[in-house]
Amino acid sequence: MQTNLLPLSKLNKGQKGIVRQIDEQLLPHDVELEAGELERQILEIGIIENVELKVLHFGLINRDPIAVQVGGDGTTIAIRRNESEIILVEPIK
């Protein structure tokens, strides 16, 4: 893993990052899914390696879920904070 990568959940509102890795081994232990299931779901909604993400908003309770703009076409998705932990991004300055 590159040292400058952060989980998506660590970005600030308005901050952008490039997806560099999706690693289910980083999934919190309280999330029970079959191996590969969460990664498949994330890929299906368009979060793939090398796509740009922008954090748009955090939910009111525990900053959960996180609203994220995916790519440059304006697609917005919401993802649970604990699931966003497996999406490793390289922050864009």
Language-model regions, residue ranges each:
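Compact, charge-rich alpha-helical regulatory domains located at protein termini
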Residues: M1-I48, K54-L60, D64-K93
